[in-house]
Amino acid sequence: MIDLYYYLIFIPLGYIVGSINFATIIAKIKNKDIKHIGSGNPGTMNMLRSVGKFWGCLTFVLDCAKGISFALIGRFVFKDNNLAMYVLGLSTVLGHIFSCFSKFKGGKGVATSLGAFAVISPITFAVAFTLMIGYLAFFKKGFIGSLMAICILVITNIVRNCLVRDNYYYVCLILLVLWLGLIFWTHRSNFKRIKNNTENSLSLFG
């Protein structure tokens, strides 16, 4: 019963915190409207391309922090409960994508998802993040590297849940599948641009 009360408190709070769009805030500080420059997406990649590397990296760190903070709440308040970490992490991702402060239009949820998985699966996160940066450095296609990292994290968590079968593991599996599907859905415009050979490139170190 106590856990239920915690869920009722932290899920809405996670959504509200997730709804804070740091790309929009930082771009405004720089006298720019991130939704009307570059790809129009208020997220890390567009910030890197359109506002600057430093500001893009700052956006990434702050967006990650949203997922990290609520996954940590899931870990410590709910005592390493996998379901709680998934639920609270996903609540921040939903806030980021469907921001209540921006008419339910936000970013694509990658950085916030990575932050959550950094707490849930730190070793796998380190591998996935390294591969993502490597892919971006060599091939300059940010969204493919991002999706690759998310796929690695979600699939390894699916496998882990299937093997360990903790309490409510089947709910965890459903959440993970929905999480992955949601991230792919937010990148539907990128897939269209790839198909039309108009996807933007990004030189991370150039």
Model features per residue range: what roles?
Residues 33-43, 101-114, 141-152:
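Short, non-helical or kinked segments that cap or interrupt transmembrane helices
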Residues 24-55, 188, 192-206:
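Cytosolic, membrane-interface loops and tails of multi-pass inner-membrane proteins
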Residues 48-51, 74-77, 109-139, 151-161:
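Interfacial segments of multi-pass membrane proteins
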Residues 5-29:
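N-terminal signal-anchor transmembrane alpha helix
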Residues 126, 142-150, 166-178:
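Loop-to-transmembrane alpha-helix initiation sites
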Residues 6, 55-61, 65-100, 132, ...:
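Nucleotide and nucleotide-moiety/phosphate-recognizing core
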Residues 23, 95-105, 131-139, 187-192:
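C-terminal ends of transmembrane helices
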